[in-house]
Design a protein with these regions (language model features):
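Hydrophobic C-terminal alpha-helix "anchor/cap" residues
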Residues: 124-126, 165
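Glycine-centered tight turns that cap/initiate beta-strands
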Residues: 73, 130-133, 173
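C-terminal boundary motif of the adenylate-forming
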Residues: 89, 127-151
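Conserved C-terminal "lid"/linker of ANL adenylate-forming enzymes
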Residues: 108, 135-137, 162-195
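Conserved ATP-binding/catalytic segment of the ANL
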Residues: 42, 46-51, 55-110, 115, ...
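Gly/Ser/Thr-rich phosphate-binding loop
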Residues: 1-34
Length: 195
């Protein structure tokens, strides 16, 4: 969609922010290629880094002082060095653009210590035409997916997962595939339920 807007003369200016930031932490003013999908680069008004888990952290004058009358929640979100932990996971390319990969609270942490972003796998599964919607989650200490597809498409979905697994590192491979013709359960906001 963004590429089409740019082709039709629209100028796209994207910002990454959240309620806990006054302003934004990342700014994307590029109008070209893959960078259109990026969250952006640090804007210079605050410091931005990724911690060891890949979580975006922001520090500076744009960060809130804390949650009103809730010091416990503040301490969980802002560390002793003043870094606000956003809960968003990202990767950074060689040009310094940040790309969202998922949410920290959704991470699947394997017994091996490896972290798997379900959103990353869901995006890959979304390339299968037979899949209407899906969710990836831990299922009995394995990575599994629940897929909404027509009954006659289940074999196509399972074949797609088999092929996808060949391209993934061993620890990211999907071991359990459950198919349902019924839409997957959602919360009141319309988001897929992970549990």
């Amino acid at each position: 969609i963004l590429s089409d807007l740019v082709k039709n003369g629209f100028y796209i200016n994207q910002c990454y922010s959240m309620t806990e930031l006054a302003g934004y932490g990342l700014l994307n003013v590029t109008q070209e290629g893959d960078h259109l999908r990026a969250l952006g680069k640090p804007d210079g008004f605050c410091e931005v880094k990724m911690d060891e888990t890949g979580e975006i952290c922001v520090r500076g004058g744009c960060v809130m002082l804390g949650y009103y009358k809730n010091p416990e929640a503040t301490a969980e979100t802002i560390d002793k060095d003043g870094w606000l932990h956003t809960g968003d996971l990202a990767r950074v390319d060689e040009e310094g653009y940040y790309y969202m990969t998922g949410r920290k609270k959704n991470l699947i942490i394997l017994d091996s210590g490896e972290n798997v972003s379900p959103e990353e796998l869901e995006k890959l599964l979304g390339k299968c035409d037979a899949i209407k919607e899906c969710i990836v989650k831990e299922m009995g200490k394995k990575i599994g997916t629940v897929v909404c597809c027509e009954d006659d498409k289940q074999q196509q979905v399972k074949a797609f997962v088999t092929e996808l697994n060949r391209t993934l590192p061993m620890y990211k491979r999907i071991s359990v595939v459950e198919c349902s013709a019924e839409p997957l359960p959602r919360n009141a906001l319309g988001k897929l339920l992970r549990k």
